[in-house]
Amino acid sequence: LYLLSNHSKGKWTCFKIGWMFGFGYFISNLYWITNSLTFEEIFKPLIPFALILIPLFLGIFYGIAIFACSLFNLKKNFSSILILSISLSLIEYVRSFIFGGFPWNLIAYSWTDYLNFLQIVSFTGTYLFNLFSIIFFLIPAIIFFKYKKKTKLFSLAVAMAILTINFIYGAIIIKNNKKIDETNLNFVIKIISPKIEINRFFQNENPKKTILDLVKLSEPNDLKRTIFIFPEGVLSNIYLQDLKNYSYIFSENYSDKHKIILGISSNEGSYIFNSMVVLDKDANILAKYDKNKLVPFGEFLPYENLLSKFGLKKITQGYLSFSADNKRNIININNIKFLPLICYEIIYS
């Protein structure tokens, strides 16, 4: 991308290079979103459009970044690397909030499998780290510069030294944090992830059967302080308010030492929320959080008044779009504190 944009003549050509690079980049790592369109026949014709149009749209951001770089008449020098890095990192930051935001697949995500390198993010934040990552990935372009061989080797050596120092720093942080893992928290967290066929969600299965399946899988021990985490949306055909009809199942199987975290839909008047609740052994609500960031087309239909006239709806079950809340408070249950995030929201954290 750097070399092509550096050699290209014309700002429109630079835009197209960035656009096509962005299209290729996003289609290679967003193809999986089409899986969500396979569960209902009405959505299957949209698969080719989702596969092509979403990466094509997101690629425009990279096109704009390269277009902006062309205004500087870049030469083969280190300042050109900085300009391109700043341009790409700024456009990725803009992408995080414009049109509702989609801060996904940043170039910095390349480090995801290498935790040692990621520890510095606690100081830099995601987007400054993204800038550093782009600069580092562009450093090898120095070999094409008209620099002396010693200058090239020195630049590459400095880059590797910085990378090594960061790796060692990360290793130290991870080693120190292992002490936290060894702390006796006096409770157990059990994540219940049943292999429930997707068809069960669309066949209006009796919620009692699903709850009993979850209870059986959780294997509650009356003497052990435990937090059970049930899946988001596992009770797809009832609302939170209906859960009281099944409270006897919870009372018969759980004790005062148990808490249950559950993802379930809730409604207030004409509004529907994707909620996370903390329940006690009698299914009483101890805390509740309503999702702030909803998945476009997945949980709500943009321009719903218009698009619904064409028979379109959100991808998830039901026709009415979810509503977004604007509050996210730390949940504190018996001095166990956590900040709730549901699914898609993690990319905004």
Language-model regions: role of each:
Residues L1-N177:
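Membrane-embedded alpha-helical bundles of multi-pass enzymes
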